[in-house]
């Protein structure tokens, strides 16, 4: 059988297979689990016809990849972006399966969305698209079946429209989406969760590998890419702790702050992005330098912590080498698969070289805070109650600490490396192996492989 070319999915699968080699060599029976888990349980593709402001019919493709339900209902975001295709959604759903396993919560993996572009669309057009999209998706989701969430292009407004459409179609008010408004079933710190969780994870990495670059020190220089939800709240948490944020970016370029970003400026960028604006409109601000068409990684002479927070494959091999020249010690993904395979190889080679090397954390571990709080939102909905901000934040800190410990332990045991003095274990191997074992064991107990 000739399979379609799916580069993003094949990259994610290749990364997992490479990480699992030492574990599978010692546990060959799990080869069958790997063969089975890589195929989604169900793939849905459908037509979405909606009316534009001129009264004309427009059409887009809608998708939902229900990847794996071994640990709970399918769980993963809905992405609205012109680049959306089956390869990207399979990669995201595959990664989501193991990411959700690392949270310790009862969630399977899935991903969906459409090649619809919300940029430049009116509020009415987005509402009509969401209503049409949900008119097909509603028959495949539910609080105990599949619980979608937001993602790129799908914010609070879109979640509201999707929830309203589902409520009308099913005549029930249930927690079948996460990222909801606080007044109707949402959770405190859900918007902040991916960025906050990333920093909680990174704090553990720094404490073990590079305590001299504590985020409580203004001398610690942090590079962040992106300027959406993840990047904004990552930056705000870094500033709150005391370190210096040097960069943000968007699809058109990077904005470098010589003396560091302020909380007020980050919030201003948040308002700009809500209106669909670009960072280039802030290029003339004193103390900031805009670089059109460039990502931040090669623009900074000195950086200690790098946090990709934009999209997949946003750090290349050359950029990874430039970060090492700039003195980076910690790289943790806020975006999914933010680093290319070649970039990861550069970081892992640096780690293996010994003391002073780069310690890299993959997105499935370091950015699982977002879906963790989505899981906490599901728990609150099931009990018909709402926890306080502090309660949710404390639970998130605990989940990220446990995720770090799981990855550290599995990386130490199953990396296949002889861990020498000064060499840190691979969090890449640890995250992949720990997530895989948890999913595979549940599948075996369900009779999905033997």
Curated annotation (Swiss-Prot):
GO terms under cellular component: cytosol
What are the alphabetically sorted keywords of the record? NADP, Oxidoreductase
Single biological process term from Gene Ontology:
glutamate biosynthetic process
Q: Give the positions the UniProt entry annotates as the active site.
A: 111
Catalytic function, reaction form: L-glutamate + NADP(+) + H2O = 2-oxoglutarate + NH4(+) + NADPH + H(+)
GO MF terms here are: glutamate dehydrogenase (NADP+) activity
Q: Look up the signal peptide feature and give its range.
A: none
Give the EC number(s) listed in the UniProt record.
1.4.1.4
**Tell me, what's a Pfam family for it?**
ELFV_dehydrog
Q: Which pairs of positions does the record mark as disulfide bonds?
A: none
Self-association and partners: Homohexamer.
Q: Which family does it belong to?
A: Belongs to the Glu/Leu/Phe/Val dehydrogenases family.
Know the name of this protein? NADP-specific glutamate dehydrogenase
Species of provenance: Laccaria bicolor (strain S238N-H82 / ATCC MYA-4686)
Underlying gene: GDHA
């Amino acid at each position: 059988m000739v399979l379609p070319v799916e580069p993003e999915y094949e990259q994610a699968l290749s990364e997992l297979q490479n990480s699992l080699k030492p574990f599978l060599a010692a546990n060959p029976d799990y080869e069958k689990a790997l063969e089975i888990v890589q195929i989604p349980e169900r793939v849905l593709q459908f037509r979405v016809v909606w009316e534009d402001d001129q009264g004309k019919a427009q059409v887009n493709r809608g998708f939902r990849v229900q990847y794996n339900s071994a640990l709970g209902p399918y769980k993963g975001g809905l992405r609205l972006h012109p680049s959306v295709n089956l390869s990207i959604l399979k990669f995201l759903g595959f990664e989501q399966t193991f990411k959700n396993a690392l949270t310790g919560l009862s969630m399977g993996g899935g991903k969906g969305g459409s090649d619809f572009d919300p940029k430049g669309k009116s509020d009415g057009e987005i509402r009509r698209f969401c209503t049409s999209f949900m008119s097909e998706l509603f028959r495949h989701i539910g609080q105990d079946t599949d619980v979608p969430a937001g993602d790129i292009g799908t914010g609070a407004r879109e979640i509201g429209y999707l929830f309203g459409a589902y409520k009308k179609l099913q005549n029930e008010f249930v927690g079948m989406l996460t990222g909801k408004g606080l007044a109707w079933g949402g959770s405190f710190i859900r918007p902040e969760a991916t960025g906050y969780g990333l920093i909680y994870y990174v704090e553990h990495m720094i404490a073990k590998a590079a305590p001299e670059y504590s985020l409580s020190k203004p001398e610690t220089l942090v590079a962040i890419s992106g300027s959406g939800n993840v990047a904004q709240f990552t930056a705000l948490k870094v500033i709150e702790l005391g370190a210096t944020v040097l960069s943000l970016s968007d699809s058109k370029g990077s904005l470098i702050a010589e003396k560091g970003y302020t909380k007020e400026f980050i919030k201003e960028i948040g308002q700009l992005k809500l209106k669909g604006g670009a960072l280039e409109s802030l290029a003339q601000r004193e103390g900031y330098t805009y670089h059109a068409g460039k990502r931040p990684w090669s623009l900074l002479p000195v950086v200690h912590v790098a946090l990709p927070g934009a999209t997949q494959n946003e750090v290349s091999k050359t950029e990874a080498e430039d970060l090492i020249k700039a003195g980076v010690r910690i790289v943790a993904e806020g975006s999914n698969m933010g680093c290319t395979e070649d970039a990861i190889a550069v970081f892992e080679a640096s780690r293996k070289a010994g003391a002073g090397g780069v310690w890299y954390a993959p997105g499935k571990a370091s950015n699982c805070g977002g879906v963790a709080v989505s899981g906490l939102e599901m728990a609150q909905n099931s009990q018909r109650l709402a926890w306080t901000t502090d309660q949710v934040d404390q639970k998130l800190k605990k989940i990220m600490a446990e995720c770090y410990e799981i990855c550290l332990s599995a990386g130490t045991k199953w990396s296949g490396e002889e861990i020498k003095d000064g060499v840190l274990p691979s969090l890449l191997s640890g995250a992949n192996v720990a997530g895989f074992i948890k999913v595979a064991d549940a599948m075996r107990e369900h009779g999905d492989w033997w």
